[in-house]
Every structure is written in C-alpha cells, then in structure tokens.
C-alpha cells in the first residue's frame, strides 16, 4: 500500500493540472497524505429527505418503480451516499432491461443495495 501511495503522490506532483480525488473513506486516509493537498472538501452524508429525493429522481426514463418499491423507507433506513444510490439504481435498471421489463423491481434494488454496502464493508 505504501508503494502505491508513493506512486500516486509522485504522479500528482508531476501532473501540471488540477487533480481531484474522491473517497467515501475519509477515516482511512493518512494525515501525512492529506497535508499534501491544498484543499480537502467534506461532503456530509445526505439526510433522509435528501436521500428520498435522490432515490426518486435517479430512476431513468422510461423505467418506473415497481409498486412494491418504497423509496421513503429505503431513504429512512439506509444512510448511504448519492453515489451509492446511483450505483444501486444503475444495477437495478440494468437487471430490469435484461429481463425486458420497464419497471424497477424492489428485489433488484435490494440486491443492488446489498452489493454496494458489501463493497463499503457494511451489512444490509
């Protein structure tokens, strides 16, 4: 890991432009690494109302949520980032399209959420 961090820092120092890095794991980033950056901007996790809006507005047209899908409950129970919500929606949308269905299924949303939480080291 140290070798990879050193390589990344060297590439950043040699790059003539602006570099933007992103992480959902701020606690895992070494302070010495952070000191090398001019700006570090924290984006707080969206609140339940914001998550609800993200869930509902992320559904791509021409797909529609299945009648069993309760975005309000998802938003209330799952403290996740906007990026996670987008990944879950994309996963469920692809599953729907593969089936030839124009409805986002609650099961696909659940599967996608489990996958994303697993990637983050969290349970469902």
Give the role of each language-model region.
Residues 1-124:
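AAA+ P-loop ATPase motor domain of ring mechanoenzymes
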């Amino acid at each position: 890991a140290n070798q990879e961090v050193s390589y990344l820092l060297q590439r950043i120092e040699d790059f003539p432009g602006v570099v933007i890095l992103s992480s959902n794991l701020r606690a895992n980033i070494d302070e010495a690494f952070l000191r090398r950056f001019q700006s570090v901007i924290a984006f707080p996790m969206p609140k339940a109302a914001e998550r609800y809006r993200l869930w509902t507005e992320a559904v791509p047209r021409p797909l529609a949520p299945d009648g069993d899908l309760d975005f309000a409950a998802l938003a209330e129970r799952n403290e996740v980032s906007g990026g996670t919500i987008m990944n879950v929606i994309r996963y469920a949308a692809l599953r729907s399209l593969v089936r030839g269905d124009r409805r986002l299924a609650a099961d696909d949303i659940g599967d996608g959420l489990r996958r994303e939480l697993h990637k983050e080291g969290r349970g469902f």
